[in-house]
Amino acid sequence: MAFTYNYSLQASYPSQRAYVPYQQAQVPTPSPIYSLPITNTTTAGALSPSSCFLSVRQQPKEALVTVKGKEKFRKPLDPPPMLELKVSSEIDPSQQFLQNPYLFVSVSLYKHDKDEAIEGTPFDILAGTLVSSLHRLKDVNNKDGAFFIFGDISIKVQGTYRLRFTLYELQPSYFTLSDLEQHKDLERYQGAALDPPEYGTYQCLGHVLSDKFNVVLPKDFKGLEESTYLSRAFSDQGVRLRLRKEARGMMSNKRSISGSGDLTTDQSQQQQQQQQPLAKKRREDSVESANPSSLMSGFYQNVSPFVNTPYLQTQGLQPQNLQNQGLQTPVRHDANYAWNLAYDPSFMGS
């Protein structure tokens, strides 16, 4: 069979090199596989509910109820729930499950006295990140472990509840680009949309329930506690968690102790004035400026008694003469006299 030459392309090839026919230059390339690689397919397929052990390493204690419409002001469940997954060494002696990208845990809200879920969709009763993938982290004993961390969970309903954590494994199916093209050709041939090809399935490997905790109103909320050692250890390894150095109650106690130490009364008052909000100080200053007696109280202390002024001397009025006449010493406590004395030269003898 003779090949047809494409002479229009010969000019682009060097003259010293032999020309390769156009049809022979086409090298077939394999269709790519659109799927994540599995490090160990035998291990990933061997996981079963009987070989997986899911436990809660850090239990939640208290949560502040989240008001609907104000989710950005919410506070996460404290302390953040943390789970650990262990697989039997007989099934996975090399611990390949630590690198399995198909393991994830979802959370749901359950009643505290019954094994029943709370009625409603998850978005109506929970807020935040409700799914966690596997984190390979160093435990407190410096050994690798598989952990699932929920550092951003809030509850929208008040009461006493528990959290149910369910472990899943995604089992993807391998399909090539040619399979996808055949599916599209079949849709065009039949003139109707067909169900998409199966991308994979998943299986449930178990679940675990947390201890009961309270979801309270802001007036009953005790505040976030100090971050645990486990939370700090995982945060140092790159996990995004909200850390708190001291509990809120301890910080308030420290303020009260430092404020009521060996300070005198004047020093404690000055410290309270410094800690007073600026807006409150401005309101008090405005009230004092509106009161004439408080406005001129400092002025009276400087100019009274007015017995040595030139004005009184020109009138021949002395303190003893005023007292003999049954009059009081001219210490005036009205705003008009004080202003005249300050601004009228005749009152000052100038």
From Swiss-Prot:
The annotated regions of Low complexity compositional bias extend over 267-276
The protein's matches in InterPro entries, at most eight in alphabetical order, are given as: Velvet (IPR021740), Velvet_dom (IPR037525), Velvet_dom_sf (IPR038491)
Task: Please give the record's comment on domains.
Answer: The N-terminal velvet domain contains a NF-kappa-B-like fold and is involved in DNA-binding.
Q: Which superkingdom?
A: Eukaryota
Which family does the record claim for this protein?
A: Belongs to the velvet family. VosA subfamily.
In which compartments does the protein localize?
Nucleus
Function statement: Component of the VEL2-VOS1 heterodimeric complex that plays a dual role in activating genes associated with spore maturation and repressing certain development-associated genes. The complex binds DNA through the DNA-binding domain of VOS1 that recognizes an 11-nucleotide consensus sequence 5'-CTGGCCGCGGC-3' consisting of two motifs in the promoters of key developmental regulatory genes. Required for normal pseudothecium development and regulates asexual spore compartmentalization, pigmentation and germination.
Q: Which UniProt keywords apply?
A: Nucleus, Sporulation, Transcription, Transcription regulation
**What is the annotated quaternary arrangement, including any partners?**
Forms a heterodimeric complex with VEL2; the formation of the VEL2-VOS1 complex is light-dependent.
Q: Name one GO biological process term.
A: sporulation resulting in formation of a cellular spore
| Phenotype on disruption | Produces only albino pseudothecia. Reduces tolerance to oxidative and thermal stresses.
Coarsely, its chief localization is nucleus
- One GO cellular component term, please give it: nucleus
Q: Induction: what does the entry report?
A: Expression is negatively regulated by VEL1.
An example of a Pfam family matching this protein is Velvet
Q: What is this protein called?
A: Spore development regulator vosA
Bias (Polar residues): 253-266
Query: Where would I find the Velvet domain in this sequence?
Result: 46-244
UniProt motif (Nuclear localization signal) ranges: 274-281
**Which intervals of the chain are annotated as region Disordered?**
250-296
Taxonomic source organism:
Cochliobolus heterostrophus (strain C5 / ATCC 48332 / race O)
